[in-house]
């Protein structure tokens, strides 16, 4: 997406992605992501590309920040004819905010804004916690879930 379409510094971007100030359920100031019509089109196109690739027998890992049950539902509908393992990636809010600050290239307040929306009413096949477990432990959990799914198909 051309950079001029987006504004990640807090200004307006009516066509693309941008941050908008808001307040979270606990009263803290946050930034919510806003998607304009071009950003929405890109998001829909990502699903179309995923369908094309899986229909051609490609295995995919799709890393998408889907905002709650509606957006996850769009993915589930798009990929309903294919085997999918939906993994929710979580971490405590204080750790998420610390990571946001340490990265240095994030709009502070965006992580808190996403925290309260991303997993809202979403049921995953597997959840992993990137703070409570190591990368290696989470990889093993995902591999185990895939293995169990494959074994259940053979029964």
What name fits each language-model region?
Residues 1-5, 70-71, 136:
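Active-site-proximal flexible loops/turns
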Residues 36-47, 90-93, 136-139:
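Amphipathic alpha-helical transducer elements in NTP-driven molecular machines
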Residues 2-10, 80, 101-105, 147:
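A generic structural signal for secondary-structure junctions
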Residues 19-23, 43-48, 66, 86-87, ...:
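Short hydrophobic/aromatic-rich motifs at helix boundaries and adjacent loops
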Residues 1-41:
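Conserved substrate/cofactor phosphate-moiety recognition/catalytic segment
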Residues 93, 98-155:
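Small-molecule kinase domains that catalyze NTP-dependent phosphoryl transfer to phosphate-bearing small molecules
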Residues 50, 54-105, 111:
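ATP-dependent NMP and nucleoside kinases share a basic, alpha-helical "lid"
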């Amino acid at each position: 997406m051309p950079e001029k379409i987006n504004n990640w510094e807090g200004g307006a971007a009516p066509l693309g992605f941008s941050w908008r100030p808001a307040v979270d359920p606990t009263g803290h100031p946050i930034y919510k992501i806003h998607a304009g019509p071009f950003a929405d089109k890109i998001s829909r196109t990502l699903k179309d590309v995923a369908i094309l690739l899986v229909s051609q027998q490609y295995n995919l890992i799709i890393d998408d920040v889907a905002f709650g049950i509606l957006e996850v539902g769009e993915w589930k509908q798009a990929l309903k004819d294919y085997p999918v393992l939906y993994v929710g990636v979580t971490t405590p809010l204080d750790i998420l905010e610390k990571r946001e600050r340490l990265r240095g290239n994030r709009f502070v307040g965006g992580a808190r804004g996403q925290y309260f929306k991303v997993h809202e009413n979403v049921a995953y096949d597997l959840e992993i916690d990137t703070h409570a477990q190591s990368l290696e432990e989470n990889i093993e959990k995902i591999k185990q879930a895939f293995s169990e799914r494959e074994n259940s198909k053979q029964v």
